[in-house]
């Protein structure tokens, strides 16, 4: 039925792993093995070195010279805090060019008041669609003070005042 020398089929054997390895370790080893496409690209028999003219992507040229572990680390690089801050400042600077000075002052004030432990994504999530910062007092619903006798003109709150020691509401 099937021909063994068919050019469409790539046949390769995978050696069995040692039986003393647990399944998780075997899976890690399997994942680290190169794919057949990588093997064909890197083990070209026409020349001992890779012909750089045949690889159109310059990023791919530099990554092929690295070990698989270096390539894996390179793909997961995240920007540093300094780079993130520069990107956010650049983004805010672009938004400020089309706004009035008051809106620009609000957005820069939010970034300066950010504690160092909070990532910039939380600062960006506080920004409105126009790029100006929402005031945190507007975002947090206010509750009435316990001794207040004034009727509320705002919409009803879901806050329930605590019970006094006898179990009755004290308003």
Curated annotation (Swiss-Prot):
Q: How is the polypeptide modified once translated?
A: Phosphorylation of Thr-35 is required for activity.
What are the UniProt keywords, alphabetically? Acetylation, Carbohydrate metabolism, Glycogen metabolism, Phosphoprotein, Protein phosphatase inhibitor
Known Pfam families for this protein?
DARPP-32 (PF05395)
Basic and acidic residues bias (residue ranges): 19-29, 135-157
In this chain, the stretch annotated as Interaction with PPP1R15A covers 143-171
The source's superkingdom equals Eukaryota
Q: What are the protein's GO molecular function terms?
A: protein phosphatase inhibitor activity
Q: Which residues carry this modification: N-acetylmethionine?
A: 1
Alphabetical GO CC annotations of the entry are:
cytoplasm
| UniProt keyword annotation of Acetylation present | yes
Q: Which residues are annotated with the PTM Phosphoserine?
A: 43, 46-47, 67
One of its GO biological process terms is: intracellular signal transduction
**Family in the record:** Belongs to the protein phosphatase inhibitor 1 family.
Describe its function: Inhibitor of protein-phosphatase 1. This protein may be important in hormonal control of glycogen metabolism. Does not inhibit type-2 phosphatases.
Q: How does it assemble?
A: Interacts with PPP1R15A.
Name of the protein in question: Protein phosphatase 1 regulatory subunit 1A
Q: What gene is this protein translated from?
A: PPP1R1A
């Amino acid at each position: 039925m099937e021909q063994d020398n068919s050019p469409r089929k790539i046949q390769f054997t995978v050696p069995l792993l040692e039986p003393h390895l647990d399944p998780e370790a075997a899976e890690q080893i399997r994942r680290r093995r190169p794919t057949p496409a990588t093997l064909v690209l890197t083990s070209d028999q026409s020349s001992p070195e890779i012909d750089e003219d045949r690889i159109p992507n310059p990023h791919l040229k530099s990554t092929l010279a690295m070990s698989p572990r270096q390539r894996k680390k390179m793909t997961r690089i995240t920007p540093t805090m300094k780079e993130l801050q520069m990107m956010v400042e650049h983004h805010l600077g672009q938004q400020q060019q089309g706004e009035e000075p008051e809106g620009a002052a609000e957005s820069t004030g939010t970034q300066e008041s950010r504690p160092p432990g909070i990532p910039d994504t939380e600062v960006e999530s506080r920004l409105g669609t126009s790029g100006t910062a929402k005031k945190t007092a507007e975002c947090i619903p206010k509750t009435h003070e316990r001794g207040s006798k004034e009727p509320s003109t705002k919409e009803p709150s879901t806050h329930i005042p605590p019970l006094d020691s006898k179990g009755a509401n004290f308003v």
